């Protein structure tokens, strides 16, 4: 939170309460501006060294500060700029201060504990920070999309092209095999839910009735997508246990700390932004266009060929079903407004957002409305309170895609609709049936009620600070934080009886209604004690605290079949079934941490421990402890090109709690026998002694600035080991259960992160900032106390992710032909994990123009393209009929035909903006105005043998290891935007 960052910054500037001002004082006035643009800097802090006196700059960058008589030194700092010490002689009463931009965020305060932080240039961990400006250049479907390519060590990928999100964030490789894989999200101290609740479309698609019964094949959205990116001030990413240990048993997958914007002292400042744009289909699979009856006969036979490619010419008509389905370019928009300001004691920030992302398929899209109010109040010189509230409403319509054993979703059914079929409606609006399949995808997109996912969400937070003790050498502060995150989600899907696949059903017409209610509540109480001896030899910060979290989720699903025509209500069917699930978990934790900054602020040492217990564990009263230790040392300035060199090392442990239900037997009470209630036990039983997975990580690195601060390099090497993995072990059939959850085994990740930034040009009229991020990780199963097993995919016929001791945790297994009696055997055929990710960013400013571009290159890695199999079966793949027939001939014996390259190069963001001259807007009372053109994913290049829609894909949603499985996904799109933003 910015409040925390400011407190830490002020604490460093004031040296924890040096001597107070003398009785004789004078007034010093001044103005703070940017050294590169000359613009006023609002909200900069101006501290008088050796006193407790601090002032802040107002709207025009001006300040007035009381100072003792005699010579003094002012320290001026602002987030995003380098601090500056300014000597002010006794005879001088005014100063002009210019601050250089801190383009590498070295002076930003980053998280080191629950209630503490340290400047990034001193931090012993590789903590990534993404600023508000970096988040909002190009509209994005979710916050995670906005940080793609900007965080070393992070693989951030969408699961499909559907509007509304569905993004996975993986930090430093594999952290679990069967546990939760998402990072912990903390927003202004509130632990946010990132639950992904399926919409229950599997009732119709039967995706869970094939070789993989997973319910996560329904293109679900993880709920962090609800956040408004415009409200975010910065994002800090703690990537591993060495940095996130203080968050305990929920931090094994990393921690994403999000701080929202706060008001600043001064007159109200308004910002209004209006964006208009559209999305378009970026890539098609390419359907084979059958030329004539002879061509069509080779796959479909003479009867079909002569019907649709009739004599005497025998020519086949050609219809582009892909573009008929997904070629919409409807208007999208984002309207955002915010205002912030306040006095010395009261500050406020209010914002509002209205957003629409139009889908490229009929009846799909995403809408969001958000309002926020953040208020900071100083009740006295010692007591401060910060409040935050956020109301969000979202509506997602994501269509019908992904795996489908009923062959009714868009791209599954399209695979059985060759190019010579006309699927368009007639003049009366009636769609024809697909004679070669079970569904007409154009009819489904038009008539299916658009799978509304309606979410209402409230997030509230409160933070109270009390300066218990403030003296020359000591400072003791109490920090209390509490918050609640609550959302309700409703999914309503209607498959009317008029649909082709419903007409052949014994109970035509299906209405699905899912209601989910989630509540996360947490509070923490923290004490932070700072001490600095009279000698000033060191600064010690001791922190300790307690934390409590209560999570509750309830889901009810209603399925109604055989509907009365035209009715959607679930009571309009003759066959109705109801399923309900409830879960609740409580966590308790405490921590203690010590931090020391010494040797003229060059040596930083930290050590701490976190203790956690949870109702999800087998023993609810047992505490699990997670220690950490870290150190960094900034070398004295040396000769040559190096300006500042920091050596750092950190070690720590964190955990990953068992998923709710892994410790007991979940009894199904929905069964009945002749109307009498009955109980059914599942095939898998819990373990009453289940405990969290334990991650141990060590990282080391070097950070260096070069060329007088015009270049910065960060290099990090890490190794993390995860023990007590959450596994399934097979049980003897005589016991009544097939398997049981258990702890055991060990996996290891090793990786390297490199971040480079260079400012080759920095003048008043021209500046250029270049950034590059490189990341590579490899994982290995070190120990496995159970037989090798599948964690994703559909068996060796179609390929699967296979866990095996001594092998990569992300290897792909499949069938390969041999000379045996069976004719094939299973072996490794690829690996999901890429060789590396490499991103490149350029930020060029020429006078009033700014051009920003971000590209990301993923090299290596494999995926399973099963969409190609579906289209092969239907004879519609681009290389049919010859090549697809050859592939079908070896189906079941050679899975390698589905393995394709996951390499891609994506131009993720491009923005060209122009700052209007004052003469263009000053008559309105505005103080700045900007116009920009931007685009997202404008260019995508893929690996040589890739033939699918997008290598950034996951049929099973967010997964620990089983990504890169493509089955009839929502197609990829590119977006274009025009933005006008004005500040008052």
Task: Name each model-derived stretch.
Residues 51-62:
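Short, acidic Ser/Thr/Gly-rich low-complexity loop/linker segments typical of extracellular
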Residues 129, 150, 162-167, 177-179, ...:
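Residues embedded in well-ordered regular secondary structure
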């Amino acid at each position: 939170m910015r409040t925390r960052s400011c407190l830490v910054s002020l604490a460093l500037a004031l040296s924890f309460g040096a001597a107070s001002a003398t009785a004789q004082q004078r007034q010093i006035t001044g103005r703070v501006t940017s050294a590169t643009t000359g613009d006023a800097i609002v909200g900069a802090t101006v501290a008088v060294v050796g006193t407790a006196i601090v002032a802040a700059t107002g709207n025009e960058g001006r300040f007035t500060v009381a100072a003792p008589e005699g010579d003094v030194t002012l320290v001026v700092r602002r987030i995003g700029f380098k601090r500056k010490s300014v000597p002010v002689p006794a005879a001088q009463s005014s100063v002009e201060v210019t601050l250089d931009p801190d383009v590498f965020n070295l002076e930003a305060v980053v998280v080191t504990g629950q209630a503490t932080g340290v400047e990034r240039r001193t931090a012993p961990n590789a903590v990534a920070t993404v600023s508000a400006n970096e988040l909002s250049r190009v509209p994005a479907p979710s916050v995670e999309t906005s940080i793609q390519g900007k965080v070393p060590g992070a693989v951030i990928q969408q699961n499909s092209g559907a509007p509304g999100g569905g993004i996975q964030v993986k930090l430093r490789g594999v952290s679990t095999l069967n546990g939760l894989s998402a990072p912990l999200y903390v927003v202004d101290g509130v632990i946010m839910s990132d639950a992904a609740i399926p919409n229950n479309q599997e009732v119709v698609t039967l995706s869970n009735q094939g070789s993989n019964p997973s319910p996560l094949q329904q293109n679900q959205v993880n709920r962090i997508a609800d956040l408004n990116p415009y409200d975010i001030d910065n994002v800090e990413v703690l990537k591993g246990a060495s940095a996130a240990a203080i968050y305990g048993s929920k931090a094994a997958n990393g921690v994403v700390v999000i701080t929202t914007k706060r008001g600043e002292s001064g007159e109200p400042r308004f910002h209004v932004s209006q964006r208009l744009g559209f999305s378009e289909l970026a890539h098609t699979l390419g359907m084979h266009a059958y030329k004539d009856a002879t061509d069509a006969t080779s796959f479909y036979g003479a009867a079909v060929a002569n019907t649709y490619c009739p004599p005497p010419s025998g020519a086949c008509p050609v219809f582009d079903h892909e573009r008929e389905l997904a070629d919409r370019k409807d208007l999208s928009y984002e309207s955002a407004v915010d205002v912030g300001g306040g006095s010395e004691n009261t500050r406020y920030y209010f914002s509002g957002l209205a957003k629409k992302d139009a889908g490229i398929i009929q009846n799909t899209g995403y809408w969001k409305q958000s309002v926020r109010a953040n208020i900071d109040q100083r009740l006295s010189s010692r007591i401060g309170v910060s409040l935050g509230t956020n109301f969000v409403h979202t509506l997602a319509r994501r269509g019908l895609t992904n795996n489908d054993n009923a062959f009714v979703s868009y791209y599954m059914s399209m695979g059985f609709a060759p190019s010579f079929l006309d699927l368009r409606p007639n003049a009366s609006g009636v769609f024809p049936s697909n004679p070669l399949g079970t569904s007409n995808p154009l009819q489904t997109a038009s008539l299916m009620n658009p799978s509304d996912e309606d979410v209402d969400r409230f997030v509230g937070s409160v933070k109270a600070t009390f300066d218990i003790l403030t003296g020359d050498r000591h400072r003791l502060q109490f920090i209390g934080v509490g918050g609640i995150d609550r959302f309700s989600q409703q999914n309503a899907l209607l498959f009317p009886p008029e649909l082709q696949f419903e007409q052949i059903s014994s109970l035509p017409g299906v209405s699905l209604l899912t209601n989910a209610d989630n509540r996360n509540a947490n509070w923490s109480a923290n004490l932070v004690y700072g001490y600095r001896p009279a000698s000033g030899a060191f600064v010690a910060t001791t922190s300790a605290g307690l934390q409590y979290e209560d999570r509750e989720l309830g889901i009810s699903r209603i399925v109604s079949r055989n509907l009365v025509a035209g009715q959607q209500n679930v009571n309009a069917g003759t066959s109705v079934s109801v399923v309900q699930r409830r879960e609740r978990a409580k966590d308790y934790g405490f921590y203690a941490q010590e931090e020391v900054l010494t040797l003229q602020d060059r040596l930083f040492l930290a050590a701490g421990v976190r203790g956690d217990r949870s109702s999800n564990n087998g023993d609810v009263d047992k505490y699990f402890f997670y220690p950490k230790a870290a150190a960094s040392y900034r070398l004295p300035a040396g000769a040559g090109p190096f300006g500042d060199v920091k050596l750092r090392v950190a070690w720590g442990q964190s955990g990953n709690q068992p998923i709710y239900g892994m410790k007991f037997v979940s009894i199904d009470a929905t069964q009945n026998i002749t109307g009498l209630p009955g109980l059914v036990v599942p095939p898998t039983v819990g373990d009453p002694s289940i405990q969290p997975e334990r991650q141990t990580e060590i990282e080391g690195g070097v950070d260096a600035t070069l060329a007088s601060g015009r270049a910065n390099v960060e290099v990090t090497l890490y190794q993390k080991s995860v023990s007590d993995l959450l596994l399934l072990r097979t049980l003897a059939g005589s016991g009544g259960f097939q398997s049981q959850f258990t702890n055991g085994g060990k996996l290891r990740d090793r990786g390297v992160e490199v971040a480079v930034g260079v400012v080759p040009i920095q003048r008043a009229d021209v500046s250029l900032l270049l950034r590059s991020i490189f990341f590579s990780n490899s994982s290995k199963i070190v120990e496995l106390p159970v037989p090798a097993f599948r964690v994703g995919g559909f068996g060796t016929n179609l390929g699967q992710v296979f866990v095996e001791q001594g092998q990569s945790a992300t290897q792909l297994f499949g069938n390969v032909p041999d000379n045996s009696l069976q004719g094939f055997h299973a072996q490794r055929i690829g690996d999901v994990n890429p060789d590396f990710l490499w991103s490149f960013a350029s930020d060029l400013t020429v006078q009033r123009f700014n051009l920003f571009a971000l590209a990301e290159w993923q090299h290596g890695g494999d995926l399973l393209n099963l969409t190609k199999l579906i289209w092969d079966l239907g004879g519609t793949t681009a290389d049919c009929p010859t090549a697809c027939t050859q592939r079908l001939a070896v189906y079941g014996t050679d899975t390698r035909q589905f393995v394709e390259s996951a390499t891609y190069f994506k131009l993720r963001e491009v923005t060209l903006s122009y700052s209007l001259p004052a003469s263009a807007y000053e008559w309105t009372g505005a103080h700045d105005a900007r116009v920009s053109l931007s685009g997202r994913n404008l260019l995508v290049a893929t690996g040589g043998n890739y033939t699918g829609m997008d290598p950034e894909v996951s049929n099973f949603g967010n997964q620990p290891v089983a990504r890169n499985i493509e089955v009839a996904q929502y197609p990829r799109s590119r977006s274009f935007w025009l933005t006008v933003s004005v500040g008052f």
